[in-house]
Amino acid sequence: MRSMLQCMDCGREYPTNRVLYPCEACGGLLDVVHDLDALRSSVSRELFDARLGGLALPWRSGVWRYKELVYPDLADDEIVTRPEGNTNLYQSARLSEYAGIRTLYFKHEGENPTGSFKDRGMTGGVTQARVLGMKRVACASTGNTSASLAAYAAWSGLQGIVLFQNQQVALGKLSQAVAYGAVCIQVAADFDRNLELVRELSESLGIYVLNSVNPFRLEGQKTIMFELIQQLGWHAPDWIIVPGGNLGNSSAFGKGLK
């Protein structure tokens, strides 16, 4: 196999066909690692350019266009895709002038199927859930993650479960989760406690966790960088500014740029 799970703290390795979130040895976060040397001969800019703009699945997806760098050993018919990605770059002359820089672009991840970058990660996470034979997927969320999980669970035939707190909930996103048929459970606790409950449900009931602790989500989110650089003629920008929450995107972007 050309991919494995590796602990980011102690370096312990695991096969990708196991249901794991933290490292069994030290409790550290896991990362999906690919054998890039083995993949080098099958990956090229020309390959990704040839797939761009086509209608064939899964290459039409802005995530799975880069499949060799996301999940190389995966069979194409296992992929759960809407498709997502292929979000536009918008140049802003006025803001460029205001900021005193030559060129400024905005990458509009709101153009994804459920309206956020979470769809890039969820296609990877839900695909892995199906690979593992899981029947139910769950997350703790106050907004975008719940909408994305519910949508991709519905598209893949899995049961989606969302735990959300009793305040600071994005009702528009929650309505998407309800519309896509997810079981939505309101809990009188903050986000961290809801995430603990999701982990407990996973262990006791065999439900697959799809919060950012799931490393396969970051594999999808790193394609924002692949796509951005491809849109710029395979040139990396001088600076990249990204909002930070739990910094999952920061980690994913670092993987993509590496």
What are these regions (language model features)?
Residues 1-258:
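PLP-dependent amino-acid enzyme catalytic core
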